[in-house]
Amino acid sequence: WGDISSNYVQAHWVATHLPKFVEGQRNAGLPEDPSQWSIAKSIFVADNADTAIKYARDESGPYGFYFTNIQKKLLKGRGAMGLGLFKVYPDQPDEDVSVHQSLETQVIAGGVEDVVEQILELRQIIGPFGQLMYTGHDWADIPLSRRSMELMAHEVMPRVNKALGESAD
């Protein structure tokens, strides 16, 4: 088991996890190693950006269903505090938080190059981390979902690793 920052938490909040993660390692007498920290992100890759955006950012699709449910559950369990995880900026008014906004800001989606670029941008916001955990959502379209995982494994991650100067362990 290891430490994972959730896919539904905005990147600016996830960036605050790294200093605490490293502090925890230090306090436990472990080497300070961000590569032991994992980030989960909702990701969808398609052969073209239009297909990916239509599938992953449609409020009535599987990603929309996921964000609708997680927002309802966190709002019920944590009240307005739960909405904070979805805010694009800390002072964003609660009434401006929406599923549409989450799909636009928390789902990495597009063609191969789009997704590579979005992952590298995420890395710049968050800082170094070990594994990127691809969070897929209900496979409403099985061939499209399978293709997304294939593109992620065979096209996206090799390009991300090359850009970061890392091997694909």
For each feature predicted by the language model, list its residue ranges.
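Active-site-adjacent structural elements that line small-molecule/cofactor binding pockets in enzymes
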Residues: 1-169
